[in-house]
From Swiss-Prot:
This is Polyribonucleotide nucleotidyltransferase. Residues 597-656 form the KH domain. InterPro entries: ExoRNase_PH_dom1 (IPR001247), ExoRNase_PH_dom2_sf (IPR036345), GPSI/PNP (IPR014069), KH_dom (IPR004087), KH_dom_type_1 (IPR004088), KH_dom_type_1_sf (IPR036612), NA-bd_OB-fold (IPR012340), PNPase (IPR012162). Keywords: Cytoplasm, Magnesium, Metal-binding, Nucleotidyltransferase, RNA-binding, Transferase.
Length: 762
């Protein structure tokens, strides 16, 4: 690491990441040149060609009436960063891409808990992508730049926060891998954290705050080739491998802040508003503890919530006169007391809100084929969490087209997650998906990507929709389970079934033999309340053999390695239990639905693609109209033919082969053709797709002279014709065949030849 003043008022700090045989990556942070009116601004560089600007601003006046911290993170992708003009109608950037939204969430998740509790000033972090090498990803650079600009803004922020992507490539964890290197990766994870102290050996002690991880879509192929499988122990090793890189990035950010003279501003500029006063909490605790403790033993969510609300109303009524005008504080204190009681019971008694033990899973249920005309459907239930999964199959050409700065241009597998307000028994807005829904859909999508068949094995575009019909803990992991079931019901040949589970963590100081020790309790299959009141939300999805996706968010200043390893092992036990229940509902792919298209793949020579398409699409459109099949042609000559019935698909294939791999007609062959064009000198008749012949005007009158072709035939008429001649250029001359001649020829072909006269007489 190094920091320097490159010119007056412009400071630059550098972190060099050494990946051994994979080379080095250089991350630079610069401040003092761009966006100087923002409270804090940093330009982040990855090597020489990747550049983005992060600017942090804060409102001058706090929003005292807010009961939440108003932090907003926005990522602005500029197409000029990749030397492109946007493909939209107005040729300018519009709504954020999915990549941008997911990056916003990656930044928000570690930054939000780093601010002091009770801050009510509006904080906005805007990251603008200015330059991007198409072989690199910008998301982890954005995490670091956003942290650095927030640190420089002088806000009450316990940063800096460092973010790094590490990928397991050829047995080594590589930091900041490029897109080309990721093609060889088994596992890929984004890890964010901050320095919270110093280890005994003098190295920085890094607390992990956020993890977003996934197995790559080539993991099974790579593991079969000898690469290590991303098991729970391997994933834990990856988290440890990320810590030195995070420490280097945090150190560079801190050096930049120190060199530029950034200081945290006083409380007068950014006042903190405690949710409640100590006197209010003491009063609420005195009158509510016993009744609330009893209410929290009720197993059902609805009944428990109802009783809790009744107690809250009683407390408000009893304390209203004493604390007039402080009703909000009473409500906040009541919530804090609820949190304390829930956590105490878990840590001391290992007893949870609904009566389960710490490793118990709620009642599980799985069934398939619920939606009659859907190509695949399933219902997965875990306690009060209920997910309907629906699968739709279509031609590969229906894959999503992506116009963003990311390396992905098309998406064949699309996972959409919907969370309607009725799933929690509430009213609310419905319509376009919010960031949370996009994030949950992306997590479920990543969990299933490693087990999907390739396009060669299964030539379909796949849309998976997860409908959260009931929510009480981890609908995203329920979506993974429902999706696996629905995909199998649709006939998708998954390489292995995938299940997911949400884990939680509660920690507290406990007196043991006169000494205070920190106790950690890991919870399997957390409820919504346990998620809100706990210290960690930890979602793990995978097959019976390895992890396919992982998401972790923690509020603690570090989780001991043995605690994290234990949580991963506990999650695997739960995952195996869920997979057994799912296998009882369906364990192999079903027959495809009669409503799903049957897609067949054929190859045609590349030089024949133009003939198959025809001028202005004339040939391919006519095949589609005649056979009612859908046809899609790739640049390499791969043709996808889809139809809901076999004969239609086969008819289309035959017509395509007749053009691309033609059996040339011969003189004397007869056809029932269609007149496709008339001219002054004759009529053109279609014999085969892309193969026409000419009946000269002199042959149309059956021996009589005619003045005009249209007096005899018109476009669309059917004519029985015979090939009279094929010239050296392949042009075909036709003559009309009389109906009786055609019938006689057919009869002669069907009847046995007459016996020789001499033989007959004998």
């Amino acid at each position: 690491m190094s920091v320097a003043e490159t010119e007056e008022g412009v400071f630059e700090a550098t972190a060099t990441i050494d990946n051994g045989s994979f080379g080095t990556r250089t991350i630079r942070f610069e401040t003092g040149r761009l966006a100087q009116q923002a409270a804090g601004s940093v330009v982040g560089y990855l090597d020489d060609e990747n550049m983005l600007l992060s600017a942090t601003t804060a409102s001058k006046n706090p929003k005292e009436h807010f009961n939440f911290f108003p932090l907003t993170v926005d990522v602005e992708e500029r197409m000029y960063a990749a030397g492109r003009i946007p493909g939209s109608f107005f040729r300018r950037e519009g709504r954020p891409s999915t990549d941008a939204i997911l990056t916003c969430r990656l930044i928000d998740r570690p930054l939000r808990p780093s601010f002091v509790n009770g801050l009510r000033n509006e904080i906005q972090v805007v990251v603008t992508i200015l330059s991007l090498d198409p072989n690199d990803l910008y998301d982890v650079v954005a995490i670091n730049a956003a942290s650095a600009s927030t640190q420089l803004a002088g806000l009450p922020f316990s940063g800096p926060v460092g973010g790094v992507r590490v990928a397991l490539i050829d047995g080594q964890w590589v930091a900041f891998p490029n897109v080309e290197q990721l093609e060889r990766a088994v596992f890929d994870m984004v890890v964010a954290g901050r320095i919270v102290g110093t280890e005994e050996d003098g190295t920085p002690d890094v607390a992990i705050m956020m993890v977003e991880a996934e197995a790559t879509d080539k993991v099974i192929e790579l593991v079969e080739g000898g690469a290590p499988a991303p098991t729970e122990s391997v994933v834990a090793q990856g988290l440890e491998a990320a810590k030195p890189f995070i420490a280097a990035l945090c150190t560079a950010q801190q050096e930049l802040a120190d060199a530029s003279g950034a200081t945290v501003k006083t409380g007068a500029e950014y006042p903190v508003f405690p949710e409640y006063g100590d006197d209010v909490y003491y009063a609420v605790s005195s009158v509510a503890t016993d009744g609330l403790a009893a209410a929290l033993t009720i197993g059902g969510k609805a009944e428990r919530n109802q009783r809790t609300e009744e107690i809250k109303a009683e407390v408000l009524e009893r304390l209203a006169d004493t604390y007039e005008g402080r009703e909000k504080e009473i409500g906040a204190a009541f919530r804090s007391l609820t949190k304390k009681l829930v956590r105490q019971r878990i840590v001391t008694d290992h007893f949870r809100i609904d009566g389960r033990g710490v490793t118990d899973i709620r009642a599980l249920s799985a069934e398939v084929a619920l939606v009659p005309r859907a190509h695949g459907s399933a219902l997965f239930e875990r306690g009060e969490t209920q997910i309907l999964g629906v699968t739709t199959l279509d031609m590969v050409k229906m894959a999503q087209q992506i116009d963003s700065l990311g390396p992905e241009t098309t998406k064949r597998y699309m996972h959409h997650y919907n969370f309607p307000p009725f799933s929690t028994g509430e009213t609310g807005r419905v319509g376009s998906p919010k960031r949370r829904e996009i994030g949950h859909g992306a997590l479920a999508e990543r969990a299933l990507m490693p087990v999907l068949p390739s396009v060669e094995e299964f030539p379909y575009a796949i849309r998976q929709v997860s409908e959260a019909l009931g929510s009480n803990g981890s609908t995203s992991m329920g979506s993974v389970c429902a999706s696996t079931l629905a995909l199998l019901n649709a006939g998708v040949p998954l390489k292995a079934p995938v299940a997911g589970i949400a884990m939680g963590l509660v920690s507290d100081d406990v007196e043991v033999d006169g000494k205070t020790e920190r106790r950690f309790v890991t919870l399997t299959d957390i409820l919504g309340a346990e998620d809100a009141f706990g210290d960690m939300d930890f979602k793990v999805a995978g097959t019976k053999d390895f992890v396919t996706a992982l998401q972790l968010d923690t509020k603690l200043d570090g989780i001991p390695s043995q605690v994290l390893a234990g949580a991963l092992a506990q999650a695997k036990d739960a995952r195996l239990t869920i997979l057994e229940v799912m296998a009882e509902a369906i364990d192999t792919p079903d027959e495809m639905s009669p409503y799903a298209p049957r897609v067949t793949t054929i190859k045609v020579p590349v030089d024949k693609i133009g003939e198959v398409i025809g001028p202005k699409g004339k040939v391919i459109n006519s095949i589609t109209e005649e056979t009612r099949a859908q046809i899609s042609i790739e640049d390499d000559g791969t043709v996808f033919v889809g139809a809901t019935d076999g004969p239609s698909a086969q008819a289309a294939i035959d017509k395509i082969n007749a053009i691309a791999n033609p059996q040339l007609p011969t003189v004397g062959e007869r056809f029932l053709g269609t007149v496709v064009k008339t001219t002054d000198f004759g009529a053109f008749v279609a014999l085969l797709p892309g193969r026409d012949g000419l009946v000269h005007i002199s042959k149309l009158g059956k021996g009589k002279r005619i003045a005009k072709v249209e007096d005899v035939v018109n476009v669309g008429d059917k004519l029985r014709v015979e090939i009279a001649d094929i010239d050296k250029r392949g042009k075909i001359s036709l003559v009309l065949v009389a109906e009786d001649d055609d019938s006689a020829a057919a009869a002669a072909a069907d009847s046995p030849a007459p016996a020789d006269a001499a033989t007959a007489s004998s």
